[in-house]
Amino acid sequence: MNAQTSEYYQEAANPIATNPALWAKVTAPQISWGSTDIRYKKEEPAPIHSAQKSMNLTAWKGEKISAQLVVWTPKVLNDLTFMVSDLTSGSATISKENIRTGFVRYVITDELNKDGLGACGYRNSADFDSTLVADVIDHITPTLTLPANSTQGGWISVNIPQGTKAGKYTGTVTVKADGITLSELKLNLQVKNRTLPPPSEWAFHLDLWQNPYAVSRYYNVEPFSKKHFDLMRPLMKLYADAGGKVITASIMHKPWNGQTYDAFESMVTWLKKADGTWYFDYTVFDKWVEFMMDLGVKKQISCYSMVPWRLSFQY
């Protein structure tokens, strides 16, 4: 199966061959609401026996809630896209500007804990099969070409403004491809008369590590340049909006011996002078921390690390 690659996202080719027998009974594109708890396999029809055309969600004011739709098709679909309407309840409206759509994209992985020994440490790759698994929610790619005999998830997220009136809201998600409407799914949202505080007031201590070097490598831009920060802003805002409290700062070259695909470089420049004294330049560190704080992540800075795994010090 060919990889689905756009200028925004490079998807790996599927190492699992498509079994035509599984698609024999699928004679036309199928669209249904699915479950946010299921990672649908790319090479198999979705395990949905009766298409669900209506989704019922319940949320508080100020909450973000999501649903997943699924498209599976025996033929190529060009320019697949999802279009949402406003959600209305009488004269009250949740604007479609508060609704975000995205394609559920696939990443390559291997069998997890096949031998029962855990997932850390060296493993002989020949002993573990590789496959694609649904993981990334791609909000950037506007349309996608879906190959024949393949399945694609679509992620729909609704941000309910805190000032929203309680009630039952209804709207639609229209699935289009090749310039025509394939299906119109109904979305029902019951907004309760309770209000979730803004993320800045949440007590939960959310700490998801950030790697700005991965973004600069992926987009081939100078680390911590204006272009780099512009690219990171919508990405890191997702973390801030989820209630992120901690800034990840690497203050040493490869603190974990480069175990990640994109190594963490030092945000602090270490200089040892001829007279034996030390000078530390915090320019990059300051830029990064100020950037994250401006987005609302400001409770803690985790600095890695005074002693690196490899016991190798670069200066």
Regions found by a protein language model. Name each.
Residues 52-75, 153, 233, 248:
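Contiguous beta-strand segments within globular domains
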Residues 1-2:
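Hydrophobic h-region of N-terminal signal peptides that target proteins for export
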Residues 58, 70-88, 139-201, 229:
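Extended acidic/polar, glycine-enriched regions
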